[in-house]
UniProtKB/Swiss-Prot annotation:
Pfam families: RRF. PANTHER family: MITOCHONDRIAL RIBOSOME RECYCLING FACTOR PSEUDO 1 (PTHR20982:SF3), RIBOSOME RECYCLING FACTOR (PTHR20982). One of its GO terms (biological process) is translational termination. Disulfide bonds: none annotated. HAMAP family: RRF. This is Ribosome-recycling factor. The gene is frr.
Length: 185
């Protein structure tokens, strides 16, 4: 049976890893990805609505995203929202679809993106270490109160450290994959 303290730590660390993976997925790289539009909202009948709820978004060719709205009346709204975003892309509206052409990024841009990815992963590592610190503090308190024998406390501390090392290693792997994706020509 898994100790509830270990289970709690694992769940929190897993959520942190998932959050970091999600942030990295939304990051702009040299390749077009529908995920980069997830944060862009369009004012649709007074309600801020994500673009992916108003249109089909697909990758066409190597460097182009195609946004095909289900309601043609939102084409100009989607175009305005993309222009107002910090994506740095110029939407091409042909009356039926919007095309986003991704220019080949410079080496300098790629290095900037790698640096940003590294910062995101570092935030994840800090969050995981904070989870470890909080759980170890809880174990120490339980030991002082006599809820956990000293041997069990040491065993739990070792398990928490192994878990921490495992999740930090996973974050490093996620970063390396993202770095390769960014630096790929």
């Amino acid at each position: 049976m898994v100790n509830p303290i270990i289970k709690e730590a694992k769940e929190k660390m897993k959520k942190t890893l998932e959050r970091i993976e999600d942030e990295l997925r939304k990051m702009r790289t040299g390749k077009p990805s529908p995920a980069i539009l997830e944060e862009i909202k369009v004012d649709y009948y007074g309600v801020p609505t994500p673009v992916n709820q108003l249109a089909t978004i697909s990758v066409s060719e190597e460097r182009t995203l195609v946004i095909k709205p289900w309601d043609k009346s939102v084409l100009s709204l989607i175009e305005k929202a993309i222009n107002a975003s910090d994506l740095g892309l110029n939407p091409i509206n042909d009356g039926n679809v919007i095309r986003l052409v991704f220019p080949s990024p410079t080496t300098e841009q790629r290095e900037k993106w790698v640096k940003k990815a590294k910062e995101i992963v570092e935030e994840g590592k800090i969050a995981i270490r904070n989870i470890r610190r909080d759980i170890l503090k809880k174990i120490k308190e339980d030991q002082k109160e006599g809820k956990i024998p000293e041997d069990d406390a040491k065993r739990l501390e070792n398990e928490i450290q192994k878990l921490t090392d495992e999740f930090i290693e996973n974050l490093d792997k996620v970063f390396e994959i993202k770095k390769e994706e960014i630096m790929e020509f």
